[in-house]
C-alpha cells in the first residue's frame, strides 16, 4: 500500500472509519475514496457493485456497521442482523469480484462466547454460546469474518479480519438511547451536573469488566496490519487493561465535575461479565496501543462538548 494507492474507507462518517481516514491523511495517502450513505447505500447490492466497478479501489478498510449499546440491540435485533449482514457481504463480495488487492474487515470483541476464557484468544471464536444481549450483531460480524476467510481459502483473496475491543473517541455516538456505555456515561453525568441532579442512575451492577481502546489507536493498528499482516487468523486489537463499569462511571463523574451519588439499577442487564482480549498475536507482530484511558477520556469529553459528538446531544 503506497501513497498513491486507491483506498476506500467504508463507513468514514463513523467513529472507526473517521479515525482510519485521519490516520491515512496524516501519513500522506493521497487517494482516499469515501461515500456518504446518501451517495451509496451499502445495503443495496446493485449500488455497491456499480461503485466498485467504477472506482476500482485497490485497498478497502471495511469499517461500516450499524452499532449500538445493549438497549439498541435488544430493541431491534432483526435490523441489526439484516443491515450488518447486507452491508458486510455486499462490500466484501464486490471487493473480491472487482480485484481489490487487500481488504481489512473490522469485526468486534462481542463475537466471542459469553463464557470465553479471559483474556480471550482468537482461537476461542465459536467455542460456546454468544451473549444474548448482542447476539444478532455478533452473528453478523462472525459472518463477515468467515466470508473473508472463505474467500482466502477458496480464491486466495488477501482479506484479513481484526477484532477490536470496546471503542471510544472522536466521532462517537452520544445518542441517549442507542450509544455504548462510555459515551452514554459521559452524556449522563454531564447533563446531571448541568441540571444540578443529586444522583445518576446507571444500568446493571457496575461490576462488569471492560477494556476500552481509543479510536485513533485502532486506526493506527489497522494501518499497521494492512501493511504487515496477511495471515489467515483474525487479530485482536486492544490495550490489555480492564476496569469495572463502576470504576469507569466514577472516573467520568470526576472528570465532568459531578459530585452527586451514583446508583446502580441491578434490574437492568450487565451484558457479558468480563471482556478482555488476549493480545499475544498483536504484540508479537510489533504493535501496542499508545493512548491510555486516563489520556483518552478528556479527549472524548472534548469531542462531546465541541466536536462531531455535539450532533447527537
Which ranges hold each PLM region?
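NAD(P)H-binding glycine-rich loop region in Rossmannoid oxidoreductase-like domains
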Residues: 45-85, 94-97, 114
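N-terminal Rossmann/SDR dinucleotide-binding element
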Residues: 1-66
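Conserved Rossmann-fold NAD(P)-dependent oxidoreductase catalytic core, especially the SDR/UDP-sugar
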Residues: 89-134
Amino acid at each position: 500500500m503506497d501513497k498513491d494507492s486507491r483506498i476506500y474507507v467504508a463507513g468514514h462518517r463513523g467513529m472507526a472509519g473517521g479515525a482510519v481516514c485521519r490516520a491515512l491523511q496524516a501519513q500522506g495517502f493521497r487517494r482516499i475514496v469515501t461515500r456518504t450513505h446518501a451517495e451509496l447505500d451499502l445495503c443495496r447490492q446493485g449500488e455497491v457493485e456499480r461503485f466498485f466497478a467504477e472506482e476500482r479501489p485497490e485497498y478497502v478498510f471495511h469499517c461500516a456497521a450499524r452499532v449500538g449499546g445493549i438497549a439498541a440491540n435488544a430493541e431491534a435485533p432483526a435490523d441489526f442482523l439484516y443491515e450488518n449482514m447486507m452491508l458486510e457481504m455486499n462490500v466484501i463480495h464486490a471487493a473480491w469480484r472487482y480485484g481489490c488487492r487487500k481488504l481489512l474487515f473490522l469485526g468486534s470483541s462481542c463475537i466471542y462466547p459469553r463464557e470465553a476464557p479471559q483474556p480471550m484468544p482468537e482461537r476461542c471464536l465459536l467455542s460456546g454460546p454468544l451473549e444474548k444481549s448482542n447476539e444478532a450483531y455478533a452473528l453478523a460480524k462472525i459472518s463477515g469474518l468467515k466470508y473473508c476467510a472463505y474467500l482466502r481459502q477458496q480464491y486466495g483473496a488477501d482479506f484479513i479480519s481484526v477484532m477490536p475491543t470496546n471503542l471510544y473517541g472522536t466521532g462517537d455516538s452520544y445518542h441517549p438511547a442507542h450509544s455504548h456505555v462510555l459515551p452514554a456515561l459521559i452524556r449522563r453525568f454531564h447533563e446531571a451536573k448541568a441540571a444540578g441532579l443529586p444522583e445518576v442512575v446507571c444500568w446493571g451492577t457496575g461490576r462488569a469488566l471492560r477494556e476500552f481502546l481509543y479510536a485513533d489507536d485502532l486506526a493506527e493498528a489497522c494501518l499497521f496490519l494492512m501493511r504487515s499482516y496477511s495471515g489467515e487468523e483474525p487479530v485482536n486489537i486492544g490495550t490489555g487493561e480492564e476496569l469495572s463499569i463502576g470504576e469507569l462511571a466514577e472516573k467520568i463523574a470526576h472528570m465532568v465535575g459531578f459530585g452527586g451519588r451514583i446508583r446502580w439499577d441491578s434490574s437492568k442487564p450487565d451484558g457479558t461479565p468480563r471482556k478482555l482480549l488476549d493480545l499475544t498475536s498483536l504484540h508479537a507482530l510489533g504493535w501496542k496501543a499508545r493512548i491510555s484511558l486516563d489520556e483518552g477520556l478528556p479527549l472524548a469529553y472534548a469531542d462531546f462538548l465541541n466536536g462531531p459528538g455535539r450532533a447527537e446531544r
